[in-house]
Curated annotation (Swiss-Prot):
Residue intervals of the OBG-type G domain: 340-512
Entry's family note: Belongs to the TRAFAC class OBG-HflX-like GTPase superfamily. OBG GTPase family.
Principal subcellular localization: mitochondrion
Organism encoding this protein: Saccharomyces cerevisiae (strain ATCC 204508 / S288c) (Baker's yeast)
Gene3D superfamilies for this protein: GTP1/OBG domain, P-loop containing nucleotide triphosphate hydrolases
Designated name of the protein: GTPase MTG2, mitochondrial
Length: 518
C-alpha cells in the first residue's frame, strides 16, 4: 500500500474512534424500552449545543483560502473559449463528473396493533442510510471515455412498522484507469459564468490568464499538514416529521420542548461527524496503483430515527420521528496521467510518432502535416528477447506560444509528468534545431523544470541534406549545448531506421538513470 493510500485508510480508522466520543452513548437498538430511551436521552445533555460556537466536540475548524480558478476546473470544459478542443477515437483523458450520495431514509411513525387493542406502543423503525459514492483504480482501463456525467447513489428507504429499519441505499462504484488523479472542482456552468464575467471586463484577456488570475475562495480544514477542502451538505429543511398532530401542537408542549432541546444536541453531533467525514484533499487523490479496496468520495446521509426511540414514561404516544440526513452533491475532475518511463517532446512533424513506431509495438498515426498526433500513444520498447523493457509516451507536438494557450501539446503534458525522463526530438532539417530545443524547453516550463527529469536529445532526419556541411554543423551546435547541460545526444533517421539500436539503448539508460548512477 502506498503512503498516500495508507493515510486515507488511517483517517477512516480515526473516524471510527471518534464517533463514540461524539455520540457519548449508542442509540438504543430495536425494541427499546422506555427506560432505555430515557437513559439515552439523558446522556445527550452534556453534548455541546449548536449555540456554542466552539468546544471540545467541534471536530473541524476551517479557514478560507484563495486558489486560482485554473486549479478547480479544466480548460477542456470551456468549449467556447478552447480553440483547440480535440478528440481522437474513444480516448478521453479529462472528465468532470457530478457525484451525489444518497439521503438517509426517514424514521417511521407507527404503533403496534393487535386484536386486543387498537393502539399499542410505538414501533416505527429507523430509516436506512443513504448510499455512498466510491472510487477504485483498476488495471486494464486506458481511457475515461466510458465514465458517466453523473453518478447518483440511492437514497435510504424509510423505516416501517414493527420496528423494521429501511433498506440502505445502494452504493455507486466508479472504476477508473490506474494513473487517474481526482480533484474537487467547481461546476462547469459556474466556471463559464466566471470566465464570461472576466471576458466582459477585458476583451483582450486570454483564457489562460483568466484561469490564473481569477481567485476562488475555498473553505479548508486546518490543523493538518495536508489541506483538505471542507464540503458542506444542504441544511435540513425540517428537524422533525409529524403524523396526525401538527408541528404547532407539539411546539407548545413543555415535554416536547425538553425533548427537542436534547435532540438538538444529537443533531449537532451528527453535523460534526459529517464535517469530519466530508473533506477532500486540496491536492486531490493520485490513484497511481491498482486498488483492492475502493475509497469513499462522498458518504451517504444517516437514516432518521423512528418513533420507537421516543417512548418514555412521560411520552407514551410519540407521533413524530426524525428525517434522514441529506446526502452530499459535488463535482470532481478526473484527469488521466499515463504512466510511462519516457515522454517524447517535440515540435509538430518532428518525427516523434515515426520513432515510436520504429522502436516499439505501438502504431501511432503518421503523416506529413502538423498535429498528426491528437492523443497520447504509449508503446513498450524491448532491447531484445528476454531483456528489459520500458515504456514511451508520444504526445501532440508543442508549438511556439503553447504556454499562452496555442496548439494542443501542453494539455497532454500530464501524460509525461510521471515519467522518469523526457526525450526531446528535433528535426535536423529545420533551419535552427538549437532554437527549436530552447523553444521547447521554455514552453514546457523553463530549464529549471526540465532539469528535474532525465533528458535525452534526439536529432532526427539526419538523412536529409546529409551531404551538406550545414547539417552536421547544426548537429554539433545541439550536441555542444546538450553537453553543457550534461545531457546525452544522438543523431538518427527514424524513417530509414538508422542508429535506432543506439537510440533504444540510450533511451533505456535515460529511463533507468537512477539505476545507472548507483
Amino acid at each position: 500500500m502506498s503512503i498516500a493510500w495508507s493515510s486515507v485508510f488511517k483517517r477512516e480508522l480515526r473516524l471510527e474512534r471518534f464517533l463514540p466520543r461524539v455520540y457519548s452513548t449508542k442509540v438504543p437498538d430495536n425494541a427499546p424500552r422506555a427506560a432505555d430511551n430515557e437513559q439515552w436521552l439523558e446522556t445527550l445533555r452534556p453534548i455541546t449545543h449548536p449555540e456554542q460556537k466552539k468546544s471540545d466536540h467541534d471536530v473541524s475548524y476551517t479557514r478560507h483560502i484563495n486558489v486560482p480558478l485554473g486549479e478547480v476546473t479544466s480548460v477542456n470544459y470551456l468549449q467556447r473559449y478552447n480553440k483547440h478542443k480535440h478528440s481522437q477515437g474513444n480516448f478521453v483523458d479529462v472528465r468532470i463528473v457530478k457525484c451525489k450520495s444518497g439521503a438517509g431514509g426517514s424514521g417511521a411513525v407507527s404503533f403496534f396493533r393487535d386484536a386486543g387493542r387498537s393502539i399499542g406502543p410505538p414501533d416505527g423503525g429507523d430509516g436506512g442510510a443513504g448510499g455512498s459514492v466510491y472510487i477504485q483504480a483498476v488495471a486494464g482501463l486506458g481511457s475515461l471515455a466510458k465514465m458517466k456525467t453523473t453518478y447518483t447513489a440511492e437514497d435510504g428507504e424509510a423505516g416501517a412498522a414493527r420496528q423494521l429499519d429501511g433498506m440502505r441505499g445502494r452504493d455507486v462504484l466508479i472504476q477508473v484507469p490506474v494513473g487517474t488523479v481526482v480533484k474537487w472542482c467547481l461546476p462547469p456552468q459556474k466556471v463559464r459564468e466566471l470566465v464570461e464575467r472576466e471576458m466582459r471586463k477585458d476583451n483582450n484577456a486570454t483564457l489562460r490568464s483568466i484561469l490564473g488570475s481569477t481567485a476562488v475562495n475555498l473553505s479548508v480544514s486546518s490543523g493538518s499538514h495536508r489541506k483538505k477542502i471542507q464540503l458542506y451538505r444542504h441544511e435540513m429543511a425540517e428537524s422533525w416529521l409529524f403524523k396526525d398532530k401538527a408541528k404547532e401542537y407539539h411546539e407548545n408542549k413543555d415535554w416536547f420542548k425538553d425533548l427537542h432541546k436534547k435532540m438538538e444536541a444529537y443533531d449537532h453531533s451528527l453535523e460534526q461527524s459529517e464535517l469530519f467525514n466530508d473533506q477532500f484533499p486540496l491536492a486531490g487523490l493520485d490513484l497511481n496503483q491498482p486498488m483492492t479496496k475502493p475509497v469513499c468520495l462522498l458518504k451517504g446521509g444517516q437514516g432518521g430515527l423512528g418513533n420507537m426511540h421516543f417512548l418514555t414514561n412521560l411520552i407514551r404516544n410519540p407521533r413524530f420521528s426524525k428525517p434522514g440526513r441529506n446526502g452530499l452533491e459535488q463535482h470532481f475532475l478526473f484527469e488521466l496521467k499515463s504512466i510511462a518511463d519516457l515522454g517524447l517532446i517535440g515540435l509538430p512533424n518532428a518525427g516523434k510518432s515515426t520513432i515510436l513506431n520504429k522502436i516499439s509495438n505501438a502504431k501511432p498515426k503518421i503523416g506529413h502535416w502538423q498535429f498528426t498526433t491528437l492523443s497520447p500513444t504509449i508503446g513498450t520498447v524491448s532491447l531484445g528477447f528476454g531483456q528489459d523493457v520500458f515504456t514511451v509516451a508520444d504526445i501532440p507536438g508543442i508549438i511556439q506560444g503553447a504556454s499562452l494557450d496555442k496548439g494542443m501539446g501542453l494539455e497532454f503534458l500530464r501524460h509525461i509528468e510521471r515519467s522518469n525522463g523526457w526525450v526531446f526530438v528535433l528535426d535536423l532539417s529545420n533551419k535552427n534545431p538549437l532554437n527549436d530545443l530552447q523553444l521547447l524547453i521554455e514552453e514546457v516550463g523553463t530549464l529549471e523544470k526540465v532539469k528535474t527529469k532525465n533528458i535525452l536529445i534526439v536529432c532526427n532526419k539526419v538523412d536529409i541534406d546529409a551531404e551538406k556541411s550545414e547539417s552536421f554543423a547544426k548537429y554539433l551546435q545541439v550536441e555542444k549545448f546538450s553537453k553543457s547541460q550534461e545531457w546525452d545526444c544522438v543523431p538518427i533517421s527514424a524513417l530509414r531506421e538508422e542508429n535506432i539500436d543506439v537510440l533504444k539503448k540510450k533511451m533505456f539508460k535515460c529511463a533507468r538513470q537512477s539505476e545507472f548512477d548507483k
